[in-house]
């Protein structure tokens, strides 16, 4: 009887320990975003590439990015803003929401924003492997410019983020990758 009681008690304890994660599939899928949560900032040169942006290298920029949890950790929001070096003039702004697609079990994204005066929307898919992130994205502007690209993002230590925009195809034409950017946690 003692063995039976111990066995039942073990099953109950293990059930309680692991049940906490089983009922949070969105968080379980997105918990790899935890190292990104917070505010990030860096300086670079303009990347060009997207309709409405200054040409590559034409301007010094300040890059701001904030990641936060939404709705009881069921999604992650990224907001970004690129400013001219004066810290006042906005070059581009945008928001991305990352969620778990319950059908495919993939992390998917929906994005929108402005590059200069040009409005755009997009969607994509994220792959998270520890502190390495790959975002495959498709976007279209209000003017019909279609762009697909990949962002590779790596967290280096606790406070440094490196990202680059690669494999850019715009209206079925391959264009050069953007220079790597480095942001630091604020």
Where do the language-model regions lie?
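Positively charged n-region of N-terminal signal peptides that target proteins for export
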Residues: 1-4
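Bacterial N-terminal signal peptides
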Residues: 7-16
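Hydrophobic small-molecule pocket/channel-lining residues, especially in calycin-type beta-barrels
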Residues: 20-186
């Amino acid at each position: 009887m003692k063995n039976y009681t111990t066995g039942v008690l073990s099953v109950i304890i293990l059930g309680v320990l692991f049940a906490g994660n089983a009922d949070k599939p969105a968080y379980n899928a997105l918990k790899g975003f935890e190292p990104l949560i917070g505010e990030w900032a860096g300086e670079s040169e303009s990347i060009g590439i997207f309709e409405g942006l200054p040409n590559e290298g034409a301007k010094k920029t300040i890059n701001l990015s904030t990641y936060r949890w939404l709705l009881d950790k069921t999604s992650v929001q990224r907001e970004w803003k690129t400013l001219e070096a004066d810290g006042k003039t906005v070059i581009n702004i945008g928001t991305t929401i990352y969620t778990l697609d319950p059908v495919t079990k993939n992390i998917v994204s929906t994005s929108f924003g402005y590059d200069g005066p040009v409005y755009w929307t997009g969607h994509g898919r994220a792959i998270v492997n520890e502190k390495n992130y790959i975002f495959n994205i498709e976007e279209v502007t209000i003017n019909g410019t279609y762009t697909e690209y990949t962002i590779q993002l790596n967290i280096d230590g606790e406070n440094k983020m490196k990202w680059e925009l690669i494999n850019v195809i715009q209206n079925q034409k391959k264009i050069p990758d953007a220079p790597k950017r480095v942001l630091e946690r604020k």
